[in-house]
Amino acid sequence: MQIFVKTLTGKTITLEVESSDTIDNVKAKIQDKEGIPPDQQRLIFAGKQLEDGRTLADYNIQKESTLHLVLRLRGGAKKRKKKTYTKPKKIKHTHKKVKLAVLQFYKVDGSGKVQRLKKECPSVSCGPGTFMASHFDRHYCGKCGTTYVFKKADEE
């Protein structure tokens, strides 16, 4: 019987085969006509890839049936090189969460009176709730730059 083999280029090859022929025999005949080695050939019929050991009758391939020839691709994607960094990785700053951080701004004395530990900035541009930093010799506002310097007892 006669079957057709359609290649990727669109070229159609006619082969003279028997229904008892194996897929290996068909691939060998394609190699004789086209020069494509059998290990690179994939034959597809009715959406299924044909296995080498089976016969044409196993797949119900009759006279004047068309098989599609596809080339087998070996391997996968190219392996990527691992990146090498010239500088060591920068350590990111992590915010330290302090529970009840507001308590460091106030002190409660024995009688229950609340006393403010840090001075609040009197500047209009800062607004209420902006505290000044306490240094050993001054109070400093980081927002507006206002500075109050302490007088030493021996300077008076």
Curated annotation (Swiss-Prot):
One of its GO terms (biological process) is translation. There is a cross-link at residue 76 (Glycyl lysine isopeptide (Gly-Lys) (interchain with K-? in acceptor proteins)). Keywords: Cytoplasm, Isopeptide bond, Metal-binding, Nucleus, Ribonucleoprotein, Ribosomal protein, Zinc, Zinc-finger. One of its GO terms (cellular component) is plasmodesma. One of its GO terms (molecular function) is structural constituent of ribosome. PROSITE patterns: UBIQUITIN_1, UBIQUITIN_2. Residues 1-76 form the Ubiquitin-like domain. Pfam families: Ribosomal_S27, ubiquitin. The keyword Metal-binding applies. A zinc finger (C4-type) spans 121-144. It comes from the Eukaryota. In the N-terminal section; belongs to the ubiquitin family. This is Ubiquitin-ribosomal protein eS31z fusion protein. It comes from Arabidopsis thaliana.
